[in-house]
């Protein structure tokens, strides 16, 4: 956890920041004489006040610089950012969701019941489920964790959940070993971002592809895909938003990192007009792909190219139902209620589920509460039945 500093240093910190604020406030008063409004601006309806506010916001240094100064002092003295980020070593940043203790153990149980309920519903519809639990960035890079350590809850969270899923008959490949091996070839997670790198996404796609082929979970004619690697570009990680240091103190920020964009496309057609590696009817009687993907921004954001890497690893086209900013549960429940999914379900569904969401609460208020409760109840019922059989 974060170490405390001595009381004299705390007083010095407060005094220094207070002095800076007073100095900037005095400086800002120089901008008042420069204010002018249109001659016909009414005084009593608030327009003059709004005009002055806009002028002051533009000229007031505290408005523009105070956030930078506070963030710089927090970062340099306390090695902290805004709530949401944990500062690691060597310029690494982590989401605090991988460090927080769970509010209660019940949330993990509720989420597990939903996962089981989803599995039961997919089985009823004839859809095979592959649960891809993505190991936490902090689990893969403990060497870059700083003073703050993950709560004890996270110690065995990944392996315990994986064992639980497998015991329930859910296909859940172990992705941790593959990602650890891939670290020798480059970063599998981005230093300043919550997300994986294209290499990490490709590694997981290849591991899932091997598992699915070995277990014969997908039975479709092969379709070849090719991946093209683009130029490297500077990537600003999403965790940097919790360190509002630029433009004044951008030199304090972790060094910029490069992201090499990858794009995957179907292989070009052969001279006879047939796609390389494809059969006469790519998807049997239907043109709808028999493979689907659902999950979070790990799957939805094209920067990581997980969708493309999975297509190439499985030699099969897919429909991507993943969404950004909603976690793994909400897109899955939306999918279960999707009319097209109901009428023409895929043969196989890959559910990408980052480890950090396992004990987290999700906003499921858009769904009918009774329906969600029924899903949980069906999952819990299967769990109790399995436990009674083992007794």
UniProtKB/Swiss-Prot annotation:
Q: How does it sit in the membrane?
A: Peripheral membrane protein
UniProt cross-references to InterPro entries, sorted A to Z: AlgJ, ALGX/ALGJ_SGNH-like
Q: Which residues form the signal peptide?
A: 1-39
Write out the GO MF terms. Answer: acyltransferase activity
The UniProt entry's GO biological process terms, in alphabetical order, are:
alginic acid acetylation; alginic acid biosynthetic process
Catalytic residues in the record:
193, 195 (proton acceptor), 297 (nucleophile)
Which major enzyme category is it? transferase
Q: Which UniProt keywords apply?
A: Acyltransferase, Alginate biosynthesis, Cell inner membrane, Cell membrane, Membrane, Periplasm, Signal, Transferase
Q: Where is this region: Disordered?
A: 259-286
- Subcellular localization, as worded in the UniProt entry: Cell inner membrane; Periplasm
Q: Name one GO cellular component term.
A: plasma membrane
Q: What is its EC number?
A: 2.3.1.-
Its annotated pathway reads: Glycan biosynthesis; alginate biosynthesis
Q: Which residues cross the membrane?
A: none
Q: Which family does it belong to?
A: Belongs to the AlgJ family.
User: What is the documented function of this protein?
Assistant: Together with AlgI and AlgF, forms an inner membrane complex which probably interacts with the alginate polymerization-transport complex and adds acetyl groups at the O-2 and O-3 positions of mannuronate residues. Acetylation of alginate is important for the architecture of biofilms and increases resistance to opsonic killing in the host.
User: Mind telling me what this protein is named?
Assistant: Probable alginate O-acetylase AlgJ
Q: Which organism is it from?
A: Pseudomonas aeruginosa (strain ATCC 15692 / DSM 22644 / CIP 104116 / JCM 14847 / LMG 12228 / 1C / PRS 101 / PAO1)
Kindly list the organism's lineage: Bacteria, Pseudomonadati, Pseudomonadota, Gammaproteobacteria, Pseudomonadales
């Amino acid at each position: 956890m974060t170490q405390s500093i001595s009381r004299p240093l705390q007083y010095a910190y407060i005094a220094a920041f207070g002095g800076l604020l007073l100095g900037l406030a005095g400086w800002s008063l120089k901008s008042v004489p420069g204010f002018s409004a249109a001659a016909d601006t009414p005084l009593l309806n608030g327009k003059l006040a709004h005009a002055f506010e806009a002028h002051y916001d533009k000229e007031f240094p505290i408005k523009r610089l105070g956030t930078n100064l506070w963030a710089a002092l927090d970062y340099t003295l306390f090695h902290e950012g805004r709530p949401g980020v944990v500062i690691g070593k060597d310029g690494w940043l982590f989401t605090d969701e991988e460090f927080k203790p769970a509010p209660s153990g019940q949330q993990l149980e509720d989420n597990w019941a939903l996962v089981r309920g989803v599995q039961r519903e997919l089985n009823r519809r004839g859809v095979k489920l592959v649960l891809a639990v993505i190991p936490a960035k902090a689990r893969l890079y403990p060497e870059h964790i700083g003073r703050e350590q993950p709560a004890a809850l996270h110690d065995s969270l990944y392996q315990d959940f994986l064992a639980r899923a497998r015991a329930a008959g859910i296909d859940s490949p172990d992705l941790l070993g593959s990602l650890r091996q891939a670290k020798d070839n480059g970063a599998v997670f981005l230093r300043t971002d919550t997300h994986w790198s294209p290499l990490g996404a490709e590694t997981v796609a290849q591991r899932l592809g091997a598992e699915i082929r070995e277990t014969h979970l997908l039975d479709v004619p092969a379709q070849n895909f090719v991946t093209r690697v683009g130029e490297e570009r500077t990537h600003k990680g999403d965790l940097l938003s919790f360190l509002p240091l630029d433009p004044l103190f951008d030199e304090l920020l972790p060094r910029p990192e490069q992201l090499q964009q990858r794009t995957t496309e179907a292989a070009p057609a052969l001279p006879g007009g047939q796609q390389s590696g494809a059969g006469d009817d790519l998807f049997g009687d239907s043109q709808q792909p028999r493979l689907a993907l659902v999950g979070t921004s790990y799957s939805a954001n094209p920067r990581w190219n997980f969708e493309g890497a999975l297509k190439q690893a499985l030699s099969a086209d897919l429909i991507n139902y993943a969404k950004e900013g909603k976690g793994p549960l909400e897109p899955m429940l939306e999918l279960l209620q999707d009319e097209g999914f109901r009428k023409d379900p895929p043969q196989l569904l890959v559910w990408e589920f980052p480890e950090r969401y396992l004990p987290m609460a999700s906003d499921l208020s858009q769904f009918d509460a009774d329906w969600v409760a029924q899903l949980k109840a069906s999952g819990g019922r299967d769990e109790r039945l399995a436990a009674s059989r083992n007794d």
